[in-house]
């Protein structure tokens, strides 16, 4: 390829001016031909010299052109190698982008499913509570209408006839019932207001959970290498503990004879009090050996606190940060709901 194709400036072509014509060469033939023949031979020799100089100049230009061609070929080879490396790097980057997109889609699918399921469950609970509050409100309104009708009927009966004492007692009873109904109505309205506030809080919690899901999705998009980890749910209550307590109670109810028989059997198995003492010594040594790593760990932690108190404070600050508390609340919310519904012990 040439410099014009690559966009490089072409070297200037320098054409040297022809030299002065040489004096005519005098030979015996020119003497025989005379002055006219000598001039003719001189012009021929001058033309030959100019042609030879032009040929030399062309050879020099040819050498320069070949040298420049070699330089351009070398430059082209370097550019081709760099282009191949760039193409390979572009292919690697595209492959990496595809793998990251696959990983992001695989990680986002379960998170989306969990968020949708949680939002659906909360919406269902909110709908049920709204329906219950609406039914309770309708029942109270119907009861209030019935009492109002009874009050009007009793008022008409008292107005058109009846004993004065019975009228007063009936009026007092009706007034007391009316006050009671008004109190019940106010209490029902207060309960409805509290339920509405609770439903609003549930809606805010649902929006907050959706915002947390969106934040996790953004984190997966920005940092695809980093694995978005959802905090694990708290384990159910330990039933083995209850079983151990029951076994302890059963063991405490055994008879004294069984305990003595067990002690006698252990004595016979372990070879008497001396073997039992050796066994206790070995168990004590094992306890000491197990306690030593904990002691070293505590000393190293104390040394770290003495050297750099800011590290422990930063760790504690990260544990009590708003993000950690939000994730903990999001993780423990199903258990709290189970406890509120009476499915877990208080």
Swiss-Prot record:
Question: Source organism's superkingdom?
Answer: Eukaryota
Q: Name one GO cellular component term.
A: membrane
User: How does this protein lie in the membrane?
Assistant: Single-pass membrane protein
Q: Which positions, given as ranges, span the membrane?
A: 282-302
Q: Which Pfam families match?
A: TMEM191C (PF15194)
Coiled coil regions in record: 52-206
Q: Where in the cell is it found?
A: Membrane
Specify where the region named Disordered lies, as residue ranges.
101-120
InterPro entries named in the record: TMEM191B/C
Write out the entry's keywords from A to Z: Coiled coil, Membrane, Transmembrane, Transmembrane helix
Family recorded in the similarity comment: Belongs to the TMEM191 family.
What PANTHER family does the annotation carry? TRANSMEMBRANE PROTEIN 191B-RELATED (PTHR38498:SF1)
| Protein name (record) | Transmembrane protein 191B
Q: Which organism is it from?
A: Homo sapiens
Its organism's taxonomic lineage begins at:
Eukaryota, Metazoa, Chordata, Craniata, Vertebrata
